């Protein structure tokens, strides 16, 4: 019954999101129409803008409207929409929402430190399910929003830990990204980015991670509050890296649990993604941490189900379907380059110190 309710609520979020801000072609045929559209967009998204900024922002908005409009006229497997980022330049968008320069942090931290083992290596590709969706299995919490803090690495880490914890304990618990932002600072850099594998090892060495309720997200670099560690803890036993540049290996991992992945999200098509299988422009300059929570196919195109952390109004209720099995070994947007997942051996967690675990289902 709970799973049916979860699927219904997820479908409702997708429907509500799809019915968001829209426009008529006539509104973009004149300067006056575009100006009215911009004011309507600002009201819809409650975007605060000073009068002094309006002309500059309107110019950016006009450019983005035409990009969305012209892209949607083409016969592509995905669509764009005017979301909350519509009056940001691509550079402003990248600086604010894709600030985790994975390559930079990889150079600072050196080679990967995960186990050289890959526990799913033995899996037979031909026997894997044709599609997997961990949302429908109740292993994914509701979509979260990192805001203008470059903490995507923390959200990616937490999504993977929430998933394996549900799989092992049958309890879905929303965990604290802010604890990682504030406390995992020896090598990761809070709102200035980080690496998911480092965060997994922090959680292991720290004895676990606390809940979202105990240590709520603030979207800023704060001082580590050790007292908030006294709440419920979810533990892991380490992590493993998925063999890089190998989408088949990634498929084996995602078939078994949600996986942290890094991607290049710094394109206008990604900025305004709305629905469908994303085959748009993106490179391999990894700048954003997300989570692969499933895979499938649509009209003959294979895709990854990727959970983002930009709120439910972006994409398909906060998710994007990224094309799967392309010619390049790195995968679309570099999705196969930096994948890792947490290991959890036990089917239980430490006894709660303050009340019971809150099951999100």
Swiss-Prot record:
<keyword id="KW-0325">Glycoprotein</keyword>
<dbReference type="GO" id="GO:0008234">
    <property type="term" value="F:cysteine-type peptidase activity"/>
</dbReference>
<feature type="active site">
    <location>
        <position position="152"/>
    </location>
</feature>
<keyword id="KW-0378">Hydrolase</keyword>
<dbReference type="InterPro" id="IPR038765">
    <property type="entry name" value="Papain-like_cys_pep_sf"/>
</dbReference>
<keyword id="KW-1015">Disulfide bond</keyword>
<feature type="glycosylation site" description="N-linked (GlcNAc...) asparagine">
    <location>
        <position position="124"/>
    </location>
</feature>
<keyword id="KW-0256">Endoplasmic reticulum</keyword>
<keyword id="KW-0788">Thiol protease</keyword>
<keyword id="KW-0645">Protease</keyword>
<dbReference type="InterPro" id="IPR000169">
    <property type="entry name" value="Pept_cys_AS"/>
</dbReference>
<feature type="active site">
    <location>
        <position position="288"/>
    </location>
</feature>
<dbReference type="GO" id="GO:0006508">
    <property type="term" value="P:proteolysis"/>
</dbReference>
<dbReference type="Pfam" id="PF00112">
    <property type="entry name" value="Peptidase_C1"/>
</dbReference>
<dbReference type="InterPro" id="IPR039417">
    <property type="entry name" value="Peptidase_C1A_papain-like"/>
</dbReference>
<dbReference type="InterPro" id="IPR013128">
    <property type="entry name" value="Peptidase_C1A"/>
</dbReference>
<protein>
    <recommendedName>
        <fullName>KDEL-tailed cysteine endopeptidase CEP2</fullName>
        <ecNumber>3.4.22.-</ecNumber>
    </recommendedName>
</protein>
<feature type="disulfide bond">
    <location>
        <begin position="183"/>
        <end position="224"/>
    </location>
</feature>
<feature type="signal peptide">
    <location>
        <begin position="1"/>
        <end position="20"/>
    </location>
</feature>
<dbReference type="Pfam" id="PF08246">
    <property type="entry name" value="Inhibitor_I29"/>
</dbReference>
<dbReference type="InterPro" id="IPR013201">
    <property type="entry name" value="Prot_inhib_I29"/>
</dbReference>
<comment type="function">
    <text>Involved in the final stage of developmental programmed cell death and in intercalation of new cells. Cleaves extensins, thus probably supporting the final cell collapse.</text>
</comment>
<keyword id="KW-0865">Zymogen</keyword>
<feature type="propeptide" description="Activation peptide">
    <location>
        <begin position="21"/>
        <end position="127"/>
    </location>
</feature>
<feature type="glycosylation site" description="N-linked (GlcNAc...) asparagine">
    <location>
        <position position="75"/>
    </location>
</feature>
<feature type="short sequence motif" description="Prevents secretion from ER">
    <location>
        <begin position="358"/>
        <end position="361"/>
    </location>
</feature>
<feature type="disulfide bond">
    <location>
        <begin position="149"/>
        <end position="191"/>
    </location>
</feature>
<dbReference type="InterPro" id="IPR025661">
    <property type="entry name" value="Pept_asp_AS"/>
</dbReference>
<feature type="disulfide bond">
    <location>
        <begin position="282"/>
        <end position="333"/>
    </location>
</feature>
<dbReference type="InterPro" id="IPR000668">
    <property type="entry name" value="Peptidase_C1A_C"/>
</dbReference>
<feature type="active site">
    <location>
        <position position="308"/>
    </location>
</feature>
<comment type="similarity">
    <text>Belongs to the peptidase C1 family.</text>
</comment>
<dbReference type="GO" id="GO:0005783">
    <property type="term" value="C:endoplasmic reticulum"/>
</dbReference>
<dbReference type="InterPro" id="IPR025660">
    <property type="entry name" value="Pept_his_AS"/>
</dbReference>
<keyword id="KW-0732">Signal</keyword>
